[in-house]
């Protein structure tokens, strides 16, 4: 029997390949219009942490579950119905009684326009008092998830941690349980200034994220995430952090893993948005002192950029869960992210065959 590369829990002993913890919102997409001028919206489900579980299930065929909470009303049931299409198991969704008007509990709404040309993508979230933001330690049976059912991987991120004062405690509780049972943990820093603004600001974001990262095996984040969420500096970037030198990123990673030696792998996408419709796109990942880079895709045509990073994350994790080397995994993540941005919504509509074709350099000729 050949030696495994990543020392993950055996698939046969686990019900889940991955369990994700995070908010699932209802995304309202105005199509080619602006949010403020639209007269109709198309709906999708989405959330930074959930999108990873959905990609692994829908595109890559793995068994995944989501831990979240929803207000039990028609909007929550619409989100549930959308999640059914993605195939992510909902047995650990916590349903909260609705008060009839949303004074005490609600479901999150995310109005997002895709952008085009010189008009950037833009979002307007309505997510105060959501059911998931009120999750508290002790409400989820993590022992059941990681011991009785078993999960090879656990994923959460900085968006969930920023929702309230209690959500970091829930994330920490989940990580402790996952680690006790040998489950790998990934964390996407995903710094959102708007979420932290009323929750302690950048100082609190740094404190919370630094505590959580001490439990993490795979850390995902771009240069802004590492500076704002962890307090590290990336050299040789402009004030808007729009250009990233690979050598500077490598030096920053080395400082991160020196302070957090538990981190085995660090990954990020590299995006230079020439316009909303054309981005230079690639990805890199670090492990054991070496940096692995994907194929560069200059001027990649973008239909909807939202969720590209989450799809990179799910492709990367798929590579590791299937015991590929890190070069293959980062190529898989970059290809999946590129494909996810060719269709509307936060989540991928790609298949594994699509991803493998793009990884091999396949073009856009008609497949017959």
Ranges and model annotations:
Residues 44, 52-63, 85, 319-322:
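Alpha-helix C-terminal capping segments
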Residues 63-158, 355-368:
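Conserved N-terminal subdomain of the carbohydrate kinase-like
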Residues 64, 90, 185-187, 220:
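Hydrophobic beta-strand scaffold residues
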Residues 169-182, 207-215:
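Catalytic-core regions built around general acid/base machinery
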